[in-house]
Amino acid sequence: MEAALLSGFIKAILPRLFSLVDDKHKLHKGVKGDIDFLIKELRMIVGAIDDDLSLDHPAAAAVQTLCMEDLRELAHGIEDCIDGVLYRAARDQQQSPVRRAVQAPKKLQRNLQLAQQLQRLKRMAAEANQRKQRYTAAAPGQHGQVYSSAAAQVDEPWPSCSSASDPRIHEADLVGVDADREELLEQLAERQPEQLKVIAIVGFCGLGKTALAAEAYNRETGGGRFERHAWVCAGHRSAREVLGELLRRLDADGRSFHGDSDAGQLCVDIRQQLEKNRYFIVIDDIQTEDQWKSIKSAFPTDKDIGSRIVVTTTIQSVANACCSANGYLHKMSRLDKNCSKQLLSKKACPERYSHYKQPDSAAILKKCDGQPLALVTIGEFLQANGWPTGPNCEDLCNRLHYHLENDKTLERMWRVLVRNYTSLPGHALKACLLYFGMFPSDHPIRRKSLLRRWLAEGFVEPLSSSSNIDSTAAFNVLMDRNIIEPINVSNNDKVKTCQTYGMMREFISHMSISQNFVTFFCDDKFVPKYVRRLSLHGDTVVNGDNFNGIDLSLVRSLAVFGEAGTTVLDFSKYQLLRVLDLEKCDDLKDDHLKEICNLVLLKYLSLGGNISKLPKDIAKLKDLEALDVRRSKVKIMPVEVFGLPCLIHLLGKFKLSDKVKQKTEVQEFLLKGKSNLQTLAGFASNGSEGFLHLMRYMNKLRKLKIWCTSSAGSTDWTDLREAIQQFILDEKEANIGTRSLSLHFSGCSEDAINSLKEPCYLSSLKLHGNFPQLPQFVTSLRGLKELCLSSTKFTTGLLEALSNLSYLQYLKLVADELEKFIIKVQGFPRLLRLCIVLQYPTFPVIEEGALPFLVTLQLLCKDLHGLSDIQIECFKHLQEVTLHSGVTPATRQEWVKAAKEHPNRPKVLLLKSVDTAESEHTDVDSVMEAVKSETTEYSIAPEGPEQVNNKMQLDHGLESSSVLNKQNNFADQSSSKDQLHYSFNNMGLSDVSCCE
C-alpha cells in the first residue's frame, strides 16, 4: 500500500523537478546537472517500486516499509526544494527593480544554499537506492523476494466459497434484513416477465450482500421452484475459472467438464446443461464488466421459463451492466440505529451478562455506521476486551484505527478496507481517497470544493490524459465503488455533498497518519513529525506549546473547523501553502488577510468567519484558481480579484466595484482577453456598474449567477442586458459545452429579460421573478437541457410554450399555483425528470403516452390529494416518485399501492424540506426519507428524529451510476427498479445546476 502511494507521489513531482531546469529560473549549470541526476534517480526508484508491485507478492514487509520511509523522506525533500525555489521566484517577481537589485547578494546566497541542498538530496537518493538493493537482494524467495504473513494479509484474496453460505457472516448475525429478503424473494417468484431476469445486489463491502443472496438461495433451493441451481464465487478469478466452477456444480457426473476448455467452450457446455430448465444461479462478487460479459453468454434466455440469476458486487457500474436488460437492481442499505444496537449487543455481550446494564455504545455505533460486518467484528473485539465490564467504548474508539490493523479480532474488517484501497487503479485515486482525512468524520464534504482542492494539490489534472485522471473521473470512480456515499443530491441528479463510511473513515485516518499524509490536531491529539497537510477540528485551541519544533513553512494544505488559535493563524510562518480552507474557522479576522496575501503559491482559498473586506493585496496571489467567500461577510469584491491570471472559480454574493470605470491594470488585463474565469456565482447588480462592460471580455465564463437589485438610480438596465446577451450568445460552435445562467430578476424591469434576442445558447437556466409569459429568448435557446422557473403563478400560455422545448431533460417549476394545463403526447419529448413545487395542488393533466422517457416524478405539495388523476403506469421508464412529507397517510398509501402495481415498482420517497431556498451557506438543505413500497408500514427516518436535520442523508442509499454513466437510452433499463435513485437538496431554487 505504501509503495503504490509513494510511487504516485514521485511521479507527480517529477514534472515540477523538470520545471526547475527551465531557463526562467536562471540556475547555475552545475545546479541543473544535479537536478538532472535527481530526475534520473527518481525515475529508477519509481521503476523499482512498480516492478515490486507488479509481482504476485510484496517484498519482505519490514525491509519494504523501511525502504518506503527512506524514499518518502527523499521525495518530500525534493518537493520542498522545488517548491522553495518556486516560492522565492514568485516573491522576487513581485518586488520592484530597485528592491531586486538590493536583494541580489541574498539571492546569490540562496543559490549557494540550493546547490548544497541538491548535493544532500543526491547523497540521500544514492544511499536510499543502495540500501534498497542491498537488503532486498539479501532476502531469499521467489524472484529474490521474501514473504511474510503480514504482507500476505493485504494481497491474499477472499477464500472462495463452495456453498451458499457466506463464510464471513453466520445466519445468527442477520439482523434487520427481513424487508430486503422479502423483496428479493418477490423478485425471484415474480412470474412477469417470464424470460431470464438478472438481479444485481450492490453496496459497499460488509453490508451483507452475500448473506442476503445466501438467504434467498437456501430458501429457493429447497422449494422446488427451480430445476437447476448453483452458487459460484467470482472474486479474484478469471471468467474461465468462474465458468469452470459453475459447470462442475451443474454437472454432478463431471462428464461435461474438461480442464483445458476455454471460456467459449465452457459457455457452450453450460448452455447445454441449462437449456429448457428453470434455473437459479448465484454469482458472488463480480468485479468487472468484462468478467460479466464473458460469463453471461453461458446462460440461455429461453422465454416462458422464468430463470433467475443473482449477482453481488461492490461496483455500481458492474451492477448496472448485469441488470441492464430486464433486470432488477437492489441497493443495500445500512442498518438503522435499533438494528445496529441489537447486532452489536448480540456479538459484544456474553450471555452471562445479558441482564447486566450495558455501557453507552453511541460512540462505537457511530464508528460502525450501520455496517453489519463492522458491527459483528467490533462486537467480537469488545467482548474480547471484557465488555460490558471492561473498558468503555469511548476508550476503545479513540484507538480504533490502531486496533484495526493490529488486532486479530478485527482482521476481517481490516481486510475489507485494505481490499477497497489497494484495488483502486492508480496512485491518484489513493491520494484522493486519503484526502478525505482532512475533514471531520461528521462533516458533509462539498463535491465541487473537494475537486478543486484535489486539483490544487496536484493529485489530478484538469482534463484526463493517457497518463492522468481528471478530478471528476476520480470522484466518479470512488462513487462507483461505493467507497464514498452521496449525502445530498440536487434535483438534476448532481451529487452536491458526500462523505465516507464510518469504518472507511477510520482506515483513512490510520493510513493518513502512517503515511504522514495528513497531520491531525483534534481534541488535543497531535502527532507531530513533519507537517505537510494540517487539519484542525474539535474544540481545542492550538497554542504555541503544541507547535514547538514544528516547521509550518512546509504545510501544503490547512483546514480549520472551529477555533485555531494565534499560532496556527500566524500566516507569516507558512510559505508553501496551496490549499487554505478557513470558511469554518471561528477566530479568523480581517487582520489575518495581510499575511495570507503573501502566500504566493496559494491555489485554493475559502474564507468565512468575520472576514468582511478583501484587501487590494489579494492581487499578489497570481496562482489562485478558486476563491470562495460564500461563508464570509464580504459585500464588495475588489476589482483586483478580476486581474488574477489563474482565477477560475469566484464564489459568493457580492457587489462589484465601480473603480473599473477608471483605466486600470485590471481593465487592460480584461480587455486583452487574459481572464481564465469560468465560474462567477455570483454578484448583485443594479444595472449601472461599469464592470458590466468588461464581462464581454471574459471569454471562458461558463457559469454565471446574478441577483438584480433595485436602487434609486437603477432605471437603466441596458448594461446588464448587454452583459447577459454577450454571455448567452450562440457562437454556433459544434460543441460549446456547459453554460449555465442563474438570474434573480425580481428587482429589475422585465424588459431587461424580454429584450434578450437570439441566437443564444445555454445548457442550464434558472429564472426567479414574476413573468406572466415565458421570455422569448428561452424558447430559442439552443442546447437547453435543464430549466428551473420560480414565480408566483404560471399561466397556461407559459406552460404550453415550455412544452415545445424539445431537448429539455429536466424541468422544475416552483409557484403558488399553476393555471389549467394539459401535457400532451407531443410535449416534452425528451424529459427525464419533472419536479413541480406548489402551495396549492393545481397539478397539470398528463395525457396517456406523454412524457415517454420520464424517470423521476416529484410532486411537492403538502395538500396533494391521492393520485391527482396521474396514471403512473403510463410512464414506462419511471423509477422514482417523490412526494412532500406533509401529505396525508392515505395519499402516501395510494402512491405506494400504485408503485407496487407498476411493472418497474418505482421507489416512493418523501421529501422533508428545510426553509433555506435562498441560503448560500447551507451544505445540506433537505432530507429524503424512504417509504418501502413492499410494506404498508412507512420506514421514515429510521435513524431517529433527532438526526433528521443533522445527518441529512438517504437511508436507502442512492445510485452513483447516474453520475458515472449517463444512459441516453433508458429503454434498455426499463425494468431495473432501482437503476436511478435520486435525492433533492431543497424545495427552493438554489439547487439548480447553475448554482454552486
Curated annotation (Swiss-Prot):
InterPro entries: Apaf_helical, Disease_R_plants, LRR_dom_sf, LRR_R13L4/SHOC2-like, NB-ARC, P-loop_NTPase, Rx_N, WH-like_DNA-bd_sf. GO terms for cellular component: cytoplasm. GO terms for biological process: defense response to bacterium; innate immune response-activating signaling pathway; plant-type hypersensitive response. The keyword Transmembrane helix does not apply. Disease resistance (R) protein. Resistance proteins guard the plant against pathogens that contain an appropriate avirulence protein via an indirect interaction with this avirulence protein. That triggers a defense system including the hypersensitive response, which restricts the pathogen growth. Contribution of RGA5 is required to recognize the effector avirulence proteins AVR-Pia and AVR1-CO39 from M.oryzae. Acts as a constitutively active cell death inducer that is repressed by RGA5. It is found in: Cytoplasm. Keywords: ATP-binding, Coiled coil, Cytoplasm, Leucine-rich repeat, Nucleotide-binding, Plant defense, Repeat. It comes from Oryza sativa subsp. japonica. Belongs to the disease resistance NB-LRR family. One of its GO terms (molecular function) is ATP binding. SUPFAM superfamilies: L domain-like, P-loop containing nucleoside triphosphate hydrolases. LRR repeats lie at residues 481-503, 504-528, 529-549, 577-599, 600-621, 622-644, 698-722, 759-781, 782-804, 805-830, 851-874. This is Disease resistance protein RGA4.
